[in-house]
């Protein structure tokens, strides 16, 4: 089987970036699994059309809470329709994973590879762990080319399910290199300004040369069959 599973990590993105990303995917008949960090009217309006899972942040500086219990309580209140989670910065441990299982989670996607195809597996808590094939930020951090290489195309066309991660801010801004987005985050003055960024500000920050959006758009065209985390989970249960 050769499926591409498209996932979107909100990471406190502003509504214009979320709308831009989800509209693009919808217009190309791609139904993503969205991992939410916060309330989004755009995502919530699409709850009947797309899968929505959770994106908790387990860290002392988390806006979700300062303890595992606080983070779990906060994140479980966010509207969602899939019992799955992916931790922000992949920051999880035995205690946090156990807490998410106790809260009803069935799917985890917290192993991020550098373009490796690894099949899903059950972990010690009974979660179905679904490894990530490619994450946009990690791809930029590794300084991979912004063109589809022959090697990447060969892997994409080969056997196995590949999970990719798109961040709305990376996609909408068309980030050309890792430091570009880092500098934006430093300049906007806090998470509140980041989350409430206007369309005009977002447009002013957009990179007009070749960037990660260009690569992702081409990547999505290479693999014709798209699936979702929910579809994958149901296929494993059969």
Task: Write out the residue ranges for each language-model feature.
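Terminal accessory/targeting
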Residues: 1-49, 73, 77-81, 94-106, ...
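Glycine-rich phosphate-binding "P-loop"
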Residues: 2-9, 53-66
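Core nucleotidyl-transferase/polymerase catalytic module
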Residues: 45, 64-70
């Amino acid at each position: 089987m050769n499926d591409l599973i498209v996932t979107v990590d909100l990471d406190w993105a502003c509504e214009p970036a979320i709308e831009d990303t989800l509209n693009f995917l919808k217009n190309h008949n791609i139904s993503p699994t969205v991992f939410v960090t916060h309330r989004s009217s755009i995502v919530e309006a699409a709850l009947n059309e797309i899968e929505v899972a959770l994106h908790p942040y387990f860290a002392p500086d988390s806006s979700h809470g300062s303890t595992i219990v606080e983070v779990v309580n906060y994140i479980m209140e966010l509207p969602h329709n899939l019992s799955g989670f992916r931790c922000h910065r992949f920051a999880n441990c035995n205690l946090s994973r156990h807490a998410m299982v106790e809260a009803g989670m069935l799917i985890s996607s917290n192993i991020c590879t550098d373009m490796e195809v690894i099949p899903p597996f059950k972990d010690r808590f009974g979660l179905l762990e679904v490894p990530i094939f490619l994450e946009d930020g990690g791809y930029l951090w590794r300084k991979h080319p912004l063109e589809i290489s022959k090697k990447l195309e060969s892997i994409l066309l080969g056997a196995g399910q590949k999970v990719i991660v798109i961040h709305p801010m990376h996609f909408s801004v068309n980030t050309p290199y890792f430091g570009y987005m880092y500098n934006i985050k430093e300049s906007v003055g806090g998470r509140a300004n980041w989350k409430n960024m206007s369309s005009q500000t977002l447009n002013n920050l957009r990179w007009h040369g070749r960037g990660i959006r260009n690569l992702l758009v081409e990547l999505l065209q290479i693999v014709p069959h798209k699936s979702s985390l929910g579809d994958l989970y149901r296929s494993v249960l059969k």
